[in-house]
Amino acid sequence: MLALMDDIQSAVFACVAVVIAIYAVRWYTDPINSIPTVGGSSLPGLSLLTAWRTVHNCREVLTAGYRKYPDSVFKIAMFDSWLVIASGRNMIEEVRKRHDELSTTLGIQEALRSRYIRDRQVMTDEYHVRVVKEKMSGRTLQAMLPDVIEEVSIAVKDHIATQGSGWTSLEVVPAMQKVIFQVNNRAFVGPVLCRSKEYLNVAIDFSEHTFKWSAILSVTPEFVRRIIAPFINEAKNDTRRAVPLLRPIIEERMKAQADLGEGWHDKPNDILQFVLDKAIPKEESMFLIVHRLLIVNHAASGNSVNAITYVLYHLAENPDILQACREEAEAKIAADGWTSTALANMWRLDSILRETLRYHGTALVSMNRLATKDVVLSDGTRLPKGTFMQAAAYPLHRDGALVENAHTFDPFRYARMRDADGEGLKHQASTTSPEYIPFGHGQHACPGRYFAAYVLKAILAHLIVNYDLKLGGDGSRPPIRYVLSAVLPPPGGCVLLKERGEGSTTTTG
């Protein structure tokens, strides 16, 4: 009997040894292990500690990797996989060129953990992204902007209430969230629904729930994700809440399209209609149409809220910067009225927006990519199929070799560059380059960035022309938060504002 027990024990130990050996061989022969690790050890088991460090010190880990491996790649640990980081402008340029092998669509889906949050039918054909790319630039965008600019004064009046001639404390994030969602939705769904509090609340909830679950799932092992996936229903429930709000408008437009066809001369010029033009031939359900619209809302609004919050803090902190931007805005409005031309010529306002996106950013990383096949980079690095990749944005934007006084916030840095070299487009907030990637870079850069820049400048111009701003308390800006790879404004942060008196009669309305 004892001999039998010894044989069983020996067999168990042998099986365990074989399993360990197989696992070790697979680990040592995995091409991903040839990529240097930053933040700790890459050994099995110890990599979990590395992942924990990355979660809590992502900014420091990215900066260390950027300095150690310039114009190359390195990897950082996630809880169940590796994230490969493109480091430096030369590698960013290579990633841009390899778009056939490094998919942006799949990369964004991986970054957001979309397969757990969004409807799978939407993910298989993201034509709403093509709609934004085709319609939110050029002549179509210019045709939208008069209505968008008009909506700014209405939205500010709806969501920012001042108290007589005195100073009013404004909690910036929730106020700007409502203003931006309303202004954006003037171009998305038209003037009636964009002012519906119920609809705006649903759109905001969808965006917040998407961010929340993306963050939670990014630090959750795969086996746990599979267990909790059936219970992640908030974004889909938000879509169901929005369906009855949008159904009357959608059904009315579908009927008009069926009855009038090419004779529908007053056909709406908004994102909902552009989505319907593609959805109707596909016979998509009401749920999927609304789901797509809310996804566009999330993409267009979340980062804009954070960006405008940082700009407002800087304007409220420094009265000289505020006055310089105000004088320019008033001069351009006097010349061209509240138009896209006036907004395009507000170089100082555009400069402070671009500098804010460079200096603070809305994320520490950018340019989500997923390898659709084995990829060999120019330096010989092999990326196995399925590798998830991002670019290190924060250390790139703070690189003193690329940006003079990179660790100093210089609000009019890019306005001076436009004056000096005469290349206005090159230094606009919406123009990407290998050194400036808050919107990504290349043909797959954020397609809504031109629209977003106009919206942000229109809101900022309206506020600085019609209101005085200052910081409360000790007059210092509240600190920014870094959560995983996200850059977030502080909760509860406020500025003080009051309506300007004589000389501030210019409005967007």
From Swiss-Prot:
Keyword RNA-binding: no
GO biological process: secondary metabolic process; terpenoid biosynthetic process
One term of GO molecular function: monooxygenase activity
Sequence intervals crossing the membrane: 12-29
Assigned EC number: 1.-.-.-
Membrane topology: Single-pass membrane protein
Swiss-Prot/TrEMBL keywords: Heme, Iron, Membrane, Metal-binding, Monooxygenase, Oxidoreductase, Transmembrane, Transmembrane helix
Highest taxon, organism lineage: Eukaryota
InterPro entries: Cyt_P450, Cyt_P450_CS, Cyt_P450_E_grp-IV, Cyt_P450_sf
Cofactor: heme
Subcellular location: Membrane
This protein's GO CC annotations: membrane
The protein's annotated pathway: Secondary metabolite biosynthesis; terpenoid biosynthesis
A Pfam family this chain is assigned to: p450
Positions annotated to bind heme: 446
Keyword Transmembrane helix in annotation: yes
PROSITE patterns listed in its UniProt record: CYTOCHROME_P450
Catalytic activity from the UniProt record: ganoderate DM + reduced [NADPH--hemoprotein reductase] + O2 = hainanate A + oxidized [NADPH--hemoprotein reductase] + H2O + H(+); ganoderate TR + reduced [NADPH--hemoprotein reductase] + O2 = ganoderate Jc + oxidized [NADPH--hemoprotein reductase] + H2O + H(+)
Similarity comment: Belongs to the cytochrome P450 family.
Name of protein: Cytochrome P450 monooxygenase CYP512U6
